[in-house]
Amino acid sequence: MAIEQTQKDEIIKQYARHDGDTGSPEVQIAVLTAEILALNDHLSVHKKDHHSYVGLMKKIGHRRNLLAYLRNKDITRYRDLIKALGLRR
């Protein structure tokens, strides 16, 4: 269900704005997207796992809030990120 630490480190390295950057919206959104995809795969097999479904909805809501923040803060960074992640917006 959860992503491995090595996968998370690769995502952080790819989207970080500087060394040691784990808190920028881009990094947080990219990590949440990977976690959402992993949970989505889990739920496609385990359809009755309602606890994981609730966790998925919370992660989606958190990502939505971060995307809205980034869109209001810097539209070019927002557009670059959704293009890189392949999100629908």
Curated annotation (Swiss-Prot):
An MF annotation (GO) of this entry: rRNA binding
RNA-binding is among the record's keywords: yes
Family assignment from sequence similarity: Belongs to the universal ribosomal protein uS15 family.
Xref: SUPFAM superfamilies: S15/NS1 RNA-binding domain
Gene Ontology BP term (one): translation
PROSITE patterns per UniProt: RIBOSOMAL_S15
Quaternary structure and partners: Part of the 30S ribosomal subunit. Forms a bridge to the 50S subunit in the 70S ribosome, contacting the 23S rRNA.
Protein name in the entry: Small ribosomal subunit protein uS15
